[in-house]
Amino acid sequence: MSRTVFCEYLKQEAEGLDFQLYPGELGKRIFDNISKRAWGEWMKKQTMLVNEKKLNMMNADHRKLLEQEMVNFLFEGKDVHIEGYIPQATN
């Protein structure tokens, strides 16, 4: 049986993550308060961000930037700004 959480990103009950995907206190917060769907949305944005800004995960400053963008996206309702990206219109 799947876990249900009140997702802070979606602002509704949704299926929770199966296990903690990120380390530390932030990882616990994500596990307790973010749904699979929201995490999937973040993963898409993260991939675009890493590619656009040419981030290197071996660089501590790049990891810190990515973590801050993740918190902004998942918990503070701020979208990730990716220069030149125009989202597809939904019909």
From Swiss-Prot:
Molecular function as annotated in GO: iron ion binding
Top-level taxon: Bacteria
Disulfide bond sites: none
Keywords: Iron
Keyword Signal: no
Lineage of the species this protein comes from: Bacteria, Pseudomonadati, Pseudomonadota, Gammaproteobacteria, Pasteurellales
GO biological process, one term: cellular response to oxidative stress
Record protein name field: Probable Fe(2+)-trafficking protein
